[in-house]
Amino acid sequence: MNNFIEYFYGIKIDKVIYNDKYYSFIYNGFVYRLYIYNYDPRGVKFLYYTNRMLVGNTLMSEIIINKNNDILSSYNGFVYILIKIYANVNKVISLDEISFLSNSMYKENINVNWGMLWSNKIDYLEDLINENGKKYPLIVDSFNYFVGMAENAISYFNTIDIDSGYKYVVGHKIIRWDDTVEVLYNPMNIIFDFRVRDVAEYIKNSFFNNNYNIFDELVNYLRKNYLSLMEVKLLISRLLYPSFYFEMYEDILIDNKEEKIILDVISRLDEYEDYLGKVISFFKINYDIEEIGWLKKV
């Protein structure tokens, strides 16, 4: 891999470290990541355009062009993309960081339908469990509960009237509870979505990483960012959707991680329902939102 990097990028290094997602090395004091690119190559030009708009104005990691002036590099049957990291890879994610990045760029005239995406996701995961269920008893026992949560989220989303002309902002495909800001500034994790997408994911993650300051953070966030009633309803719908469980599900069935990783989730369901109830009560103070009947009253 050292020879590949030197040949395509003119970077001569002594040591490359590999983990299950990327190759990593340090050059001139900066961390670089070399990823296998598994996405539709037709989207790479927009990926690069967005990256150029964000690099310099934020700590967005920079896509490095190869010696052929191409974004992607092919080697031994795989396609790679190289990025240079500017953010502190050890810094924890905060709502302030999410807010800053969401205000850095927006896009109009796109269609984002969480309800349809979630419904398709459930169908896909149901097919997976039907094919592999015997090997994963913990998933089999818990799956219907989380599908029920997702269906509630879909029903709630489908009642929301989306404002025409909404400006979709920089968001992220996935933010896990143990991620650092490196994930926020990874160009391959960038999407354009409703402003509250990342806020909702942060709130959910705050439960699992025991962030006891979440309500103070929300007060501070709302002082700086006005949310419309529509956006708060979108946030609630996303809170109801158990993205964390479905991400772990795919980690287990697709990436072959141990099934026991979901124990920390399924063993705290009563606590989590209480937590969601408290979050929704927090927003009800200033917004006319409906009660969620199945959540515990707080």
What are the functions of these language-model segments?
Residues 2-29:
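ATP-binding glycine-rich phosphate-binding loop
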Residues 15, 112-171, 283-297:
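ATP-dependent phospho-/nucleotidyl transfer catalytic cores
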Residues 21-45, 81:
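ATP-binding glycine-rich loop module of kinase domains
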Residues 24, 63, 155-199:
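Active-site acidic catalytic loop and adjacent metal/ATP-binding pocket
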Residues 37-76, 90-101:
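A conserved alpha-helical element in kinase catalytic cores
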Residues 86-119:
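Conserved kinase catalytic-core helix
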Residues 195-228, 239-268:
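Active-site activation/catalytic loop segments of kinase-like enzymes and analogous catalytic loops
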Residues 246-298:
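ATP/Mg2+ or Mg2+-diphosphate-binding catalytic cores
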